[in-house]
Design a protein with these regions (language model features):
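Positively charged n-region of N-terminal signal peptides that target proteins for export
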Residues: 1-4
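Hydrophobic core
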Residues: 9, 13-17
């Protein structure tokens, strides 16, 4: 009888899969479970090869593995009202776990969470300041957020880049939002420390695209950055990497990726080993772990928290939520080895190296590294 009931339940739930979704939605993964996962995108789309895409892929893979309903939604515009509209559409279609990547969701969470107490809201890169101070949400009884210590990932990428012999650097951030600022400031601090240790002169041209995608204007600005001497540019902002890499490819230049190991993307698209390294945060792993906690019925162990993920171990690189690729994704050499990297990670973990995480100022500062601050390109 139990087996028959289970079969009927699967058929009943599968039948509902024919319901249509939002204006832009991936094919829903529709099986059976009490947990139904929706993801709403922020500024970008699930093809940004970075933050949105990684979150989407983590949610989709988890749903497929566990037989859960999954669908993604893309807001019509870049504002809280449109984000709330997609959240409400997802809830109306039966989704009860809403995953939202990006600080811009703070206002939407603050508006929607109190109205839908039976729904679990998961915000990635949504800080206490964003959610509580800025958006004014005081009741987190159905909310869990994660922030990442991007300054550590940025530091490690900047340190590695200079140690590997690059002293003419560039930085192209997406928009001057907290996570992007922390990445960039960390990159500057790491490059500064490495230059000081090596006793070399180093400089960085520092700009923001003021958007999270590449276009002709950003490419022209990157052309100028490489023409002005940059050997490698940190492409820190979703789709802006297209402009950085297009400009780099014209002069056989180099690039640093962000959020995930972008070497497979960069190198394949531009036909040579363009990637020095990537400043990564554990989006995929932390999204998967959160969804597993929910599926295991342990939501009460994390709800109401804003987790701040960084280094969890001085020795186990795989346990850390921030870092650079330890495999082929980094351009290792005798100048900077995996053992050298492990020592820096241990020094940060043990407090020997302290990294400033100030995200209040878009313009970074350094002691040895010379900074040419360009500001917004657009």
């Amino acid at each position: 009888m139990k087996k028959l009931f289970a079969i009927l339940l699967v058929l009943a739930v599968a039948f509902t899969a024919f319901a249509q979704g939002s204006k832009e939605a991936a094919p829903a993964v529709t099986k059976t479970a009490d947990v139904a996962i929706a993801m709403v995108t922020d500024y970008g789309d699930i093809t940004d090869q970075s933050f949105n895409q990684t979150t989407y892929e983590a949610c989709k893979a988890f749903a497929e593995k566990n037989g859960l309903n999954f669908k993604y939604y893309k807001p019509a515009g870049d504002n809280t009202a449109d984000r709330v509209a997609m959240i409400e559409q997802a809830i109306g279609e039966g989704f009860n776990v809403i995953v939202m990547p990006g600080y811009a969701f703070a206002g939407a969470i603050a508006e929607a969470a109190p109205q839908y107490k039976d729904v679990k809201f998961v915000g990635l890169d949504v800080s206490e300041y964003d959610l509580v101070v800025d958006a004014g949400l005081t009741d987190l009884s159905n909310v869990y957020c994660i922030v990442y210590q991007e300054e550590i990932a940025g530091y490690l990428a900047g340190y590695a880049t200079v140690k590997l012999g690059y002293t003419k650097l560039g930085y192209c951030g997406g928009m001057a939002v907290p996570a992007v600022i922390r990445y960039g400031y960390g990159f500057v601090q790491g490059a500064d420390a490495a230059a000081k240790e090596l006793g070399v002169d180093a400089d960085i041209q520092y700009a923001y695209a003021n958007q999270f995608f590449g276009d002709a204007d950003i490419t022209a600005a990157m052309d100028a950055m490489y023409a002005n001497g940059a050997q490698v540019v940190f492409a820190c902002g979703g789709g802006v990497y297209t402009s950085v890499c297009e400009a780099a490819a014209k002069v056989n230049g180099k690039a640093v990726g962000v959020d995930v190991d972008q070497k497979p993307i960069f190198d394949a698209a531009y036909g040579y080993s363009i990637t020095v390294t990537s400043a990564m945060k554990g989006l995929y792993a932390s999204t998967t772990a959160t969804l597993q906690t929910i599926l295991d019925g342990k939501w009460d162990t994390i709800v109401g928290q804003i987790a701040n993920l960084g280094l969890a171990s001085a020795t186990d690189m795989d346990a850390n939520s921030v870092g650079i690729p330890t495999g082929a994704g980094t351009e290792w050499s005798e100048k900077f080895t995996l053992a050298d990297y492990a020592k820096v990670v241990a020094d940060i973990y043990n407090g020997k190296i302290v990294i400033d995480n100030d995200s209040s100022n878009a313009e970074p500062k350094a002691t040895t590294l010379k900074i040419n601050y360009i500001g917004n390109i657009k």
